[in-house]
Amino acid sequence: MQKAVIIYSTTDGQTKRICEFLKQKLEDKINIDLFSIEDIDRAELNFYDKIVIGASIRYGKHSPKLYKFIEKNIDVLKAKFTAFFTVNVVARKEGKNTPDTNPYMKKFLQLTNWQPNLLGVFA
């Protein structure tokens, strides 16, 4: 059975709750673990076939820890099947609720050298 990991960067806990929900929905289909972005290291990432990262917005920005994590692990992320989602209140607005139209997603993709296989936005 394939192994996946969900990694979250959260400020107030909403992103963690979303990730816990995703894990619960997927765990009967795939071996899946859940970690805070601070609690997983590069060596552990290599054990997973699929990597999902969820991150919240605080004062208009993703956490610097998110960008450092991606920069540090970019070669692993590029070699795996990956997904990324962002959690922000702007995503509740029509015209800003898709990965292609959400300003925070667009900015994130411009600032990183990572192009995940799947993208999502949640409000």
Give the location of each predicted region.
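Conserved N-terminal substructure of TIR/SEFIR domains
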Residues: 6-8
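Residues in the short beta-alpha loop(s) of Rossmann-like NAD(P)-binding domains
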Residues: 10, 38, 88
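FMN-binding flavodoxin-like domain, especially the glycine-rich phosphate-binding loop
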Residues: 2-4, 17, 25, 29-35, ...
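Glycine-rich NAD(P) Rossmann-fold beta1-alpha1 loop
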Residues: 10-17
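Short amphipathic alpha-helix with an adjacent loop that forms part of the alpha/beta core around
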Residues: 41-47
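Flexible, glycine-rich phosphate/dinucleotide-binding loops
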Residues: 13, 41, 91-93
